[in-house]
């Protein structure tokens, strides 16, 4: 069986062999894939159309998973690196790793003044060096509320991007999919 202009699918052939229930081998010749199919358990040999459809289905699923992982990584990076607040009077950048979030929540619960790591952001948007700066308990509470709102906004935005991705049902539509940028 020859699959014309199908060389882009070669990485997904092993999965097709498994899912359609056959053994065999393949060779890429130019843009074509030449398949040698051996059915398992006396089953019927799949048609070229069945093989191509299954290839597209598997490739679509794999590419959607890759894009979803990219969306998750973008969201996580923005949560960790892009949070800004003016609770200290002027704009400061704060990290929001899980540890930072836990520490912030612990300070809110303790209801105490404390130092918290942040960096001043100048008028050009350049972030200085992070240092531990004094925060009142009111500033810590406000910072926590702003951080939660920021994180929630990102999660909702990128969750909607994953919903857009999930609705895609063809490779053609997937090729046109571009992850939108969250603008603060």
What are these regions (language model features)?
Residues 1-184:
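A preference for well-ordered globular domain cores
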């Amino acid at each position: 069986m020859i699959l014309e202009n199908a060389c882009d699918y070669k990485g997904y052939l092993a999965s097709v062999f498994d899912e359609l229930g056959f053994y065999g081998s393949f060779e890429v010749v130019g843009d074509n894939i030449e398949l040698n199919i051996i059915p398992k358990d006396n089953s019927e040999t799949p048609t070229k159309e069945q093989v191509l459809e299954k290839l597209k289905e598997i490739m679509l699923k794999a590419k959607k998973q890759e894009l979803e992982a990219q969306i998750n990584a973008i969201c996580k990076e923005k949560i960790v690196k892009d949070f800004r607040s003016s609770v200290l009077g002027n704009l400061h950048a704060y990290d929001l790793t899980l540890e930072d979030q836990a520490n912030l929540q612990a300070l809110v619960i303790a209801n105490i003044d404390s130092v918290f790591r942040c960096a001043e952001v100048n008028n050009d948007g350049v972030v200085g060096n992070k240092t531990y700066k004094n925060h009142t308990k009111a500033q810590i509470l406000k910072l926590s509320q702003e951080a939660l709102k920021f994180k929630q906004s990102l999660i909702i935005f990128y969750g909607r991007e994953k919903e857009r991705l999930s609705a895609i049902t063809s490779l053609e539509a997937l090729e046109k999919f571009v992850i939108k940028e969250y603008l603060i």
